[in-house]
């Protein structure tokens, strides 16, 4: 398959994986390996990547030489907090510019605050960040974020951590059809079929965390998600047959059969 290209860099995997909620760093690494993910997102406010020298460092098991780390602003509720967090991430990662922006608007649902998200995106793009941005499934907001200069649009499929799957495929389809940057479904994926559906719609990738980390067997689920993303992408590229009513046809030709009778309803 053709690679996923984000901010000028190519990736063979279209599955992006988060690092939260695992039992320990060893399980995190095992899940990453099983998923085949190359872009790994890290919550800067919750995960140590050098801020706390006396604590285990995620970079020891997921070194930047092997993976593209995607610092994110999970837990930020203002544009100012989000910008400050990503500036810190850039310092900790020696000038790393590819980041995931999310500014939340509600602590219970974790819906994005799109006004604050747009505000933060403008600042970050101006400062040279390559911004992958978590947003609602509103096509107008998605276009505004692309116009600002975001490197990828990441609409939610449903609430973060809900596992409810894709609730509004029509809006996602509009975003995909109109976007000229990668569209990556972020939030709400619960199982492999959700990931496959997102890819069949034409999404360029899928980002997930809870669906893998909270599975009964996270490593096995990571492997399942890898296959689902690949299968969904191949199905999208292959092009599904059209849906039809009253035009059913057998998969094997009926002409030339030695025996058989015509169903009486065929002449009615």
Curated annotation (Swiss-Prot):
GO (cellular component) term, any one: cytoplasm
Cellular location(s): Cytoplasm
Keywords: Cytoplasm, Schiff base, Thiamine biosynthesis, Transferase
Residues at the active site: 100
Composition bias, Polar residues: 259-268
GO MF, one annotated term: thiazole synthase activity
Renumbered residue ranges of the record's region Disordered: 248-268
One Gene Ontology biological process: thiamine diphosphate biosynthetic process
Pathway: Cofactor biosynthesis; thiamine diphosphate biosynthesis
Annotated catalysed reactions: [ThiS sulfur-carrier protein]-C-terminal-Gly-aminoethanethioate + 2-iminoacetate + 1-deoxy-D-xylulose 5-phosphate = [ThiS sulfur-carrier protein]-C-terminal Gly-Gly + 2-[(2R,5Z)-2-carboxy-4-methylthiazol-5(2H)-ylidene]ethyl phosphate + 2 H2O + H(+)
InterPro entries membership: Aldolase_TIM, Thiazole_synthase_ThiG, ThiG
Primary residence: cytoplasm
Residues holding 1-deoxy-D-xylulose 5-phosphate: 161, 187-188, 209-210
Pfam families (alphabetical): ThiG (PF05690)
Enzyme Commission numbers on file: 2.8.1.10
Protein's job: Catalyzes the rearrangement of 1-deoxy-D-xylulose 5-phosphate (DXP) to produce the thiazole phosphate moiety of thiamine. Sulfur is provided by the thiocarboxylate moiety of the carrier protein ThiS. In vitro, sulfur can be provided by H(2)S.
Similarity remark: Belongs to the ThiG family.
Complex formation: Homotetramer. Forms heterodimers with either ThiH or ThiS.
PANTHER family: THIAZOLE SYNTHASE (PTHR34266:SF2)
Name this polypeptide is given: Thiazole synthase
Annotated organism of origin: Nitrosomonas europaea (strain ATCC 19718 / CIP 103999 / KCTC 2705 / NBRC 14298)
Biological classification of the source: Bacteria, Pseudomonadati, Pseudomonadota, Betaproteobacteria, Nitrosomonadales
